[in-house]
Structure formats: C-alpha cells, structure tokens
Swiss-Prot record:
Involved in the high-affinity zinc uptake transport system. This is High-affinity zinc uptake system membrane protein ZnuB. It comes from Buchnera aphidicola subsp. Baizongia pistaciae (strain Bp). InterPro entries: ABC_BtuC-like (IPR037294), ABC_TroCD (IPR001626). GO terms for biological process: response to zinc ion; transmembrane transport; zinc ion transport. Belongs to the ABC-3 integral membrane protein family. Its main location: membrane.
Amino acid sequence: MYKTFFFGWLAGVLLTTITGPLGLFIIWRRMSSFGDTLSHSSLLGISFAVLLNIHPFFMVIITILLFGMLIIWLNYTTVLSLDTILGIIGYSFLSLGMIIINSISNFQKNKLTNYLFGNLLEVTYIDIVILIISCVSILFVLVWYWDLMLLTTINSDLAKIDGVNVLKINSILIFLITLTIGIAIKFIGSLIAISLLIIPAATAQRFSTSPEKMAFFSVIIGIISITWGILMSVYYNLAISPTIVFCSSIVFVISNLKKIL
C-alpha cells in the first residue's frame, strides 16, 4: 500500500518540476485557453486508443502533438486570431472524439475513466521511469532556451531586432507545453490537466521577484498541493485528481487572503 502511495506522490512531484516553470509562460502569455482546449481535444486520442485497443498514453501524445502543430501552422499562415483557431480545431477534435465514444461499447467506455479523471494511485514502476526520462528531457530544452523564451514573452519585437528566431522559440514553447499536458493527462486526467500548470504558477506570483524565483515557488506550491491532495483523498476516500486541484485552489486563496482582506 505504501509503495502505491509513494509512486503516486513521486509521479506528482516529477510532474510539478515541468508544469511549474511552463505554467509561468501560460500565465504571462495568457494561454490558459490554449491549454484548456488542448486538454479537452485529447479526448480524440483517448477514444481512438480505446476503439483500436492500443495504449492510450501514446495515442494521446500523438493527438495533442498534432493539435499543437496545427495551431502553430494556422497561427502563422492565416489571418485568424489564436482564439478562433483554438475554437475551430479544439471543437473539431472534441466532437470527433465524442462521435467515436458513442460508437464503442459500454465495456470499452469504462476504460476512458482513468484518462478523463486520472488516478495517481495506479502509477507503476514503468510509469515512473518514463516520467523521469520525459521530465529530464523537457527540463533540458526549457533551461537551454529559457532566456530566449523570456525575451520573446516580454517583447517579441525586441527579440526580432536582436536576431532571435521568434517563430522557432514560440514553436518550441508550444511543443513543450503540449507534450507536458499530454504527459499530465495520464496521471491527473484530461479534464483538469491544465490546472496543474495554471494554479501553482498564479499562486507563485505573490512570492516572487524574478522569473526564476517564480518558477521555483511554482514547483514548491505544486508539491505542497500534490502531497496535501493525496493525503486528503486517501484519508477521506475522495477522487485523487480533483482533490489535488481543490487543494491547489485553497493554497491560491490562502496566498491572496491578505490582498483580499
């Protein structure tokens, strides 16, 4: 039993090491709608995986990476706003996923539950290994391009003047966010995966004086939320992923009490 809890907690902690820093860019660039649409569009990958009887994790990754590439391509080749593009592609993916779900049996539909709501208490040793490799790879790329991502976020025009390939940097950032959400979906579910990026990062703003400190505090707040959420879900027999998000929201409210009062 303790091994199960530890693996679940470790998976959550590993996730926060990438969701924390990347969540900052979602807040700074006001991309929460992008992450939310991405999470919901993953339903297409999940439903395809169940229909074809293949591992959902890889199908979800493929689907959302396709989603991300379509966003990048349309954003730079059309005059449509990003919100419009997100709406068109997101609802197209979501509706196709719902069509597939309605065509599969009730037995197969039961397999969708974990990917819709997640379950950190079903994490295996193989999941941990995959997660470690994924997190290290994403963190390496993020650290390598950190300064350029900050510059393009603060002032893309200035970045262009300095010779920065803004399209390349933005594409890398979208790719990292897309991949991170795809990984997070396996553990905390597609319906609330984006919350693990947004809430800790928003909370960290209250305690930070630099981007690096904000990234650090975002990870710490994420770990606190994961730990608290797992303990509450086990003690009170609650759904683990929503409990973690709820605990994260409470931390956010507490951090803003002084400002509210």
